[in-house]
């Protein structure tokens, strides 16, 4: 009964956009009659109106219509009405749930262009460098056509390049680069080192992957800290002889390891220590990490070991490697020891932030994905984002067949191989999604035994390089593609194959044979291979995406204008030959698409249910795009992780009661409901985990925002003298407060000691001169301090003019950074210990907030004291050589 209600609710939520879509369409005929320059002039007029405080609602329809027309002129693509609705939803700061193949990339053009007109910079966030570069080069042409600048942030860019690109109107960037640039900016020592502008508006592609899946892992910038290598080596050897369920217990659901009493005693005897938990020499964390490394972290599942003998984490949601990321709290070192690799130093956190708090810094946030509805509650509770499903342009024709469950892994993989063989015999394309590298290679080996051709895509470097090409051609006739998790792959699978990708592959194939030759001669050649070779540098330079005559002509002429190719006379021959090839290949692909459509389209095979229904839905969603036919089926085993942890025994009893043959699968509505129930339990568990992380991090977030705001003002302020004077006076106030509340020392001795300790110089005070009034005493101290500071300033300025301002800034930044680093360590230790408070009938979160705030206030006081102390103690040495 509820389903019709929700369906009507969301239909009503979209109804409000219908009038805007009609208005956008009404601008179409007028805009189509304008020249390119006239459209750009219209953009400038609208921009001025927006900057003159004209209501955005008054111009949004015309702006969207302009983007639609520009997209058609540059990419030969025209937005559908449902795509316009998607753009309006994004502009309202919501999440647009759009199925795979519905054109999310061009939908993002609409709100990004409108918000870029404010001149504050707009970010389009993607999950990897390849997608960021692809979008900047392809759809970025629309923004450039309309007069905007387009920036791109890549992993290997220098700070100067990053700053230049962040100044652009629209910036394409990955979530990783965005977060680390934010942290680095807040560690900068000069304003010139800061690369980002204030965070204004952001569209997050694959928003569920970034804001949900990666929310538990904070971004951390760390510095080296010496690792106790011997402890890791000893406990790694110890873990090898410890026995499960005797010495330790594994809670696989919660990823927790617990030592038994027998295990604790055994470890203490083996390590020849009195107490594993000794505060002065603790061993327990090393033992537990070594057991976790042995039992819970599996090579080629959770990580790989590369040729440089480094442990590289594999993202469980995307199947991609996470270069540069390390597990914290000694776990990474424990895995290195387990693999007999060099143990890297432990790291000390210098700065950190979660994606939850990073993206909440934007004035306006929106996102898009094919699968967000299952996490709707979390998006609304934590980010304040509503999920709005956008109707598909064409009805989804994919058939999702019931799951097949087998008694063991052997029977399951045999059935999957047989399914692949059956599909291959009729030339129907198949996409198989696996959960780990190990399992993808197991299936590959099995298909090799049957002489069935396949393409393999997993986190191994040699496979990643061909990722886009492998995925784009997964819809070719007879193609069998084995892939680890498909989340965030970002490339549509077109039935019959992708023409653009085919051309790219052909061009790259010939680039190695490219030799110096007269371009005019090559253009006249009838040999198409030579023609392709000659086109490689042009293609590589401009990253052509829409390969038609107009775009080729435009980019070639621009290339020629640079004087690289002196003779333009044969351009027409070149374009004619090129378009001839396009038409020929397009006709062949159309024939193949027709054939594959008759066969039923792309068939998707899932080899295991993921803990999240979203990931399963993402895999299914690769089939049946844009009204194409397709199908999906999951093949499961009772010893799959999800079934094993959540009800495998019950299902096994069901199988036995039914009395099926050993190799016969089971499929039933009861089974499907059990699986969905198991997934919901896991999703609730992880949601609670992320919610708890968010609640705890809120206290630190307020502190981080405060310290970063202060730091930013330090960089921007021309003179910090007034601040330093205020710091000194606050320090003196702290001293007088301490004296008035608690001291047994004589007044003069107390102040001499405290001012020496905190300010680096003893102040002389007499209680009689203050007439017994603490405020009079404080004013006397302030006067002494100001005189002392002025004298110190004069002394240093006489040696080197301007040095005092530099010292103030330098000492202040150094103390903020050093104190913040120590504060993060203390907060981390507090969070580790606070969990035990619940056993004492106390609320750990309340205690954490109180104690973290107290620690923060202490840190601020320490910064003030230390800055003054170092300034007064500073000396300048003059080198006369």
Swiss-Prot record:
Binding locations of ATP: 83, 101-105, 492
Alphabetically ordered keywords of this record: ATP-binding, Chloroplast, Membrane, Nucleotide-binding, Plastid, Protein transport, Thylakoid, Translocase, Translocation, Transport
GO cellular component: chloroplast stroma; chloroplast thylakoid membrane
Pfam families, A to Z: P-loop_SecA (PF21090), SecA_DEAD (PF07517), SecA_PP_bind (PF01043), SecA_SW (PF07516)
Matches recorded under CDD domains: DEXDc_SecA, SF2_C_secA
Function comment: Has a central role in coupling the hydrolysis of ATP to the transfer of proteins across the thylakoid membrane.
Name of the gene encoding the protein in the UniProt record: secA
Principal location listed in the UniProt entry: plastid
Family membership noted in the UniProt record: Belongs to the SecA family.
Record EC number: 7.4.2.8
Subcellular location: Plastid, Chloroplast stroma; Plastid, Chloroplast thylakoid membrane
Reactions the enzyme catalyzes: ATP + H2O + cellular proteinSide 1 = ADP + phosphate + cellular proteinSide 2
Molecular functions (GO terms): ATP binding; protein-exporting ATPase activity
The organism's place on the tree of life at top rank: Eukaryota
UniProt name for this protein: Protein translocase subunit SecA
Top EC group: translocase
GO biological process: intracellular protein transmembrane transport; protein import; protein targeting
Entry membrane topology: Peripheral membrane protein
């Amino acid at each position: 009964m509820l389903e019709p209600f929700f369906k009507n609710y969301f239909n009503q939520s979209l109804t409000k956009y219908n009038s805007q879509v009609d208005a956008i369409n009404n601008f179409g005929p007028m805009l189509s009659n304008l020249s390119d320059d006239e459209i750009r002039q219209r953009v400038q007029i609208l921009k001025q109106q927006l900057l003159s405080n004209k209501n955005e609602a008054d111009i949004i329809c015309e702006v969207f219509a302009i983007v639609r027309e520009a997209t058609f002129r540059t990419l030969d693509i025209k937005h559908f009405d449902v795509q316009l609705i998607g753009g309006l939803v994004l502009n309202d700061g919501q999440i647009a749930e759009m199925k795979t193949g519905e054109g999310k990339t061009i939908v993002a053009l609409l709100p990004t262009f409108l918000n870029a007109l404010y001149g504050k910079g707009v970010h389009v966030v993607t999950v990897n460098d390849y997608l960021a570069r692809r979008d900047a080069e392809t759809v970025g042409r629309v923004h450039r056509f309309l007069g905007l600048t387009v920036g791109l942030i890549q992993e290997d860019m220098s700070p100067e390049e990053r700053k230049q690109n962040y100044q652009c109107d629209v910036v394409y960037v990955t979530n990783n680069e965005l977060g680390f640039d934010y942290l680095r900016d807040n560690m900068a020592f000069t304003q010139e080192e800061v690369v980002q502008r204030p965070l204004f508006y952001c569209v997050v592609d694959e928003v569920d992957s970034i804001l949900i899946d990666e929310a538990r892992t904070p971004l951390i910038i760390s510095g080296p800290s010496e690792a106790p290598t011997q402890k890791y080596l000893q406990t790694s050897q110890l873990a090898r002889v410890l026995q499960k369920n005797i010495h330790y217990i594994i809670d696989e659901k919660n990823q927790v390891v617990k030592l038994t009493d027998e295990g604790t005693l055994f470890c203490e005897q083996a390590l020849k220590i009195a107490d594993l938990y000794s505060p002065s020499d603790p061993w327990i964390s090393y033992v537990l990490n070594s057991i976790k490394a042995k039992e819970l972290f599996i090579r080629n599942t959770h990580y790989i070991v590369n040729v440089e003998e480094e442990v590289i984490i594999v993202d469980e949601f995307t199947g991609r490697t996470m270069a540069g990321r390390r597990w914290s709290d000694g776990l990474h070192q424990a895995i290195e020891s387990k693999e007999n690799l060099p143990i890297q130093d432990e790291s000390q956190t210098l700065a950190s932030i979660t994606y939850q708090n990073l993206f909440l810094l934007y004035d306006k946030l929106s996102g898009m994905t094919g699968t967000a509805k299952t996490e709707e509650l979390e998006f609304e509770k934590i980010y304040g984002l509503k999920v709005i499903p956008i109707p598909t342009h064409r009805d989804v024709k994919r058939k999702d067949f019931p799951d097949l469950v087998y008694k063991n892994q052997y029977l399951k993989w045999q059935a999957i191989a047989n399914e692949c063989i059956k599909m291959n015999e009729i030339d129907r394309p198949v996409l198989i999604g696996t959960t780990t590298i190990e399992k993808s290679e197991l299936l590959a080996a099995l298909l090799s035994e049957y002489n069935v051709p396949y393409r393999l895509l997993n986190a191994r470097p040699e496979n990643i390089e061909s990722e886009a090409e492998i995925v784009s051609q997964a819809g070719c006739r007879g193609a069998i593609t084995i892939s680890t998790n498909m989340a965030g792959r970002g490339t549509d699978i077109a039935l019959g194959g992708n023409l653009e990708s085919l051309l790219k592959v052909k061009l790259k194939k010939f680039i190695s044979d490219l030799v110096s030759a007269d371009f005019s001669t090559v253009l006249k050649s009838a040999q198409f291979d030579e023609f392709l070779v000659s086109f490689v540098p042009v293609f590589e330079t401009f990253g052509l995406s829409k390969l038609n005559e107009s775009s080729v002509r435009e980019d070639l002429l621009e290339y020629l204008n640079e004087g690289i190719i002196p003779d333009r006379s044969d351009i027409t021959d070149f374009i004619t030959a090129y378009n001839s090839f396009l038409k020929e290949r397009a006709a062949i692909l159309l024939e193949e698409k027709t054939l594959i459509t008759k066969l039923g389209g792309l068939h998707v095979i899932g080899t295991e249910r993921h803990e999240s229904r979203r990931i399963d839905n993402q895999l299914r969603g690769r089939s049946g795009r844009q009204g194409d036919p397709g199908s999906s089926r999951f093949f499961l085993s009772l010893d799959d992780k999800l079934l094993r942890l959540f009800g495998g025994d019950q299902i096994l009893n069901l199988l036995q009661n039914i009395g099926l043959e050993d190799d016969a699968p089971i499929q039933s509505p009861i089974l499907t409901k059990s699986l969905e129930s198991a997934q919901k339990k896991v999703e609730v568990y992880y949601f609670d985990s992320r919610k708890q992380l968010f609640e705890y991090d809120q206290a630190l977030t307020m502190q981080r925002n405060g310290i970063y705001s202060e730091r930013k003002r330090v960089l921007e302020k021309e003179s910090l003298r007034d601040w330093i004077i205020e710091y000194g006076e606050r320090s003196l106030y702290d001293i007088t407060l301490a004296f008035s509340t608690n001291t047994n020392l004589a007044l003069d001795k107390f102040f001499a000691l405290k001012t020496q300790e905190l300010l680096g110089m003893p102040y002389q005070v007499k209680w009689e001169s203050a007439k017994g009034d603490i405020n009079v005493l404080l004013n006397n101290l302030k006067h002494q301090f100001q005189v002392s500071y002025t004298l110190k300033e004069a002394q240093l300025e006489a040696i080197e003019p301007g040095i005092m301002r530099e010292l103030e800034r330098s000492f202040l930044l150094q103390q903020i950074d050093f104190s913040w680093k120590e504060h993060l360590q203390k907060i981390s230790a507090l969070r580790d210990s606070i969990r035990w408070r619940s056993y004492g009938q106390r609320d750990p979160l309340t205690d954490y907030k109180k104690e973290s705030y107290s620690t923060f206030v202490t840190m601020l006081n320490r910064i003030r004291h230390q800055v003054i102390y170092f300034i007064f103690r500073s000396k300048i040495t003059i080198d006369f050589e």
